[in-house]
């Protein structure tokens, strides 16, 4: 009998994939496996019984990989399980940045006492006019599960799409639309694209990859979208550039004091995978990974301290 412990609420449709050989434990102590979403595990005392940690999500920044490796604990994640949910939010982010939809909605709310609001709206709507994304250039940095979906969807929306990923997998390459133009130098995306969306993991080599130097290469009307990891962008440099009118908008799914309320910043409260479908898919995949490891020794989608 295996014991598993959930550090966060895990979708029941996922837990239903455990059979009678698995029992949920109310305590971490004595657990053979742990399921986690966003709970911070750094500094947590890991029991000697623990064999596996499965993150119901793609990133593993909240898991102490070095400590797990030292104790022989295998860490799994669920890449691609929430990809469609994130893709849809990225597309929404592009539209929110292109047309002042949010500003228009707030104006309507503020004028709710106007008995002739329809006529007033006709006079005021010019204040919320924007641009269309069709025909614009989109640069996708990172062509993993999410990046490929974003690139393909943008093609169908009439955009001219450029993709950069020196480490693209065979699977991703097969799934990528032939209409996406391959870029070998990321600086070409910074210089040429109207929209730039980042979909790379957070590593020492990618931390603050979108820095002041990169921002200085961008067009004055550039819109940067970050639904991957907050530390991929030097947000202080980004806010300075927005204030100076050097680029148009920054859309992020990671609220913090630097960006919230700053000119040109559109910030959502980490909604990327916050859909019922994404949570279900991640939970199902995480449970199946644990079972496959416990029962068969399979090590698909593991993460390590490197």
Regions found by a protein language model. Name each.
Residues 260-299:
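Adenosine-phosphate binding glycine-rich loop
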Residues 79-137:
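Phosphate-binding beta-alpha-beta segment of Rossmann-like dinucleotide-binding domains, i.e.
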Residues 87-106, 155-159, 284-298:
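Oxidoreductase and adenylate-handling cofactor-binding alpha/beta cores
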Residues 39-44, 162, 166-259, 274:
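Rossmann-like adenosine-cofactor binding region
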Residues 301-306:
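Conserved small/polar residues in nucleotide/adenosyl-binding loops
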Residues 147-148:
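N-terminal Rossmann-fold NAD(P) dinucleotide-binding loop
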Residues 1-78, 211-213, 234:
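An N-terminal-biased, well-structured beta-alpha scaffold segment characteristic
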Residues 143-144:
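Glycine-rich Rossmann-fold phosphate-binding loop(s) that bind the pyrophosphate
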């Amino acid at each position: 009998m295996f014991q598993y412990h959930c550090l966060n609420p895990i979708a029941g449709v996922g837990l239903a994939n455990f059979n009678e050989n698995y029992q949920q434990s109310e305590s971490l102590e004595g657990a053979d496996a742990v399921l986690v979403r966003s709970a911070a595990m750094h500094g947590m005392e890991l029991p000697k019984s623990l064999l596996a940690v499965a993150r119901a999500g793609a990133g593993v920044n909240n898991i102490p990989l070095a400590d797990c490796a030292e104790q022989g604990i295998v860490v799994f994640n669920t890449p691609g399980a929430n990809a469609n949910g994130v893709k849809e939010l990225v597309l929404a982010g592009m539209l929110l940045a292109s047309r002042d939809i949010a500003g228009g909605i707030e104006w309507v709310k503020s004028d709710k006492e106007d008995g002739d609001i329809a006529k007033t709206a006709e006079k005021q709507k010019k204040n919320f006019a924007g641009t269309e994304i069709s025909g614009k250039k989109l640069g996708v940095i990172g062509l993993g599960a999410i990046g490929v979906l974003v690139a393909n969807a943008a093609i169908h929306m009439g955009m001219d799409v450029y993709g950069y990923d020196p480490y693209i997998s065979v699977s991703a390459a097969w799934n990528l639309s032939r209409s996406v133009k391959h870029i070998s130098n990321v600086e070409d995306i910074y210089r040429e694209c109207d929209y730039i969306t980042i979909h790379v993991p957070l590593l020492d080599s990618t931390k603050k990859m979108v820095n002041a130097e990169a921002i200085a290469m961008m067009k004055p009307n550039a819109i940067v979208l970050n639904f991957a990891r907050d530390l991929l962008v030097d947000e202080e440099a980004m806010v300075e550039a927005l204030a100076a009118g050097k680029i148009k908008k920054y859309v992020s799914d990671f609220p913090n004091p630097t960006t919230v309320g700053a000119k040109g910043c559109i910030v959502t409260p980490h909604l990327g995978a916050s859909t019922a479908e994404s949570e279900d898919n991640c939970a199902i995949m995480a449970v199946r990974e644990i079972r496959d490891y416990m029962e068969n020794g399979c090590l698909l989608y593991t993460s390590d301290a490197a």
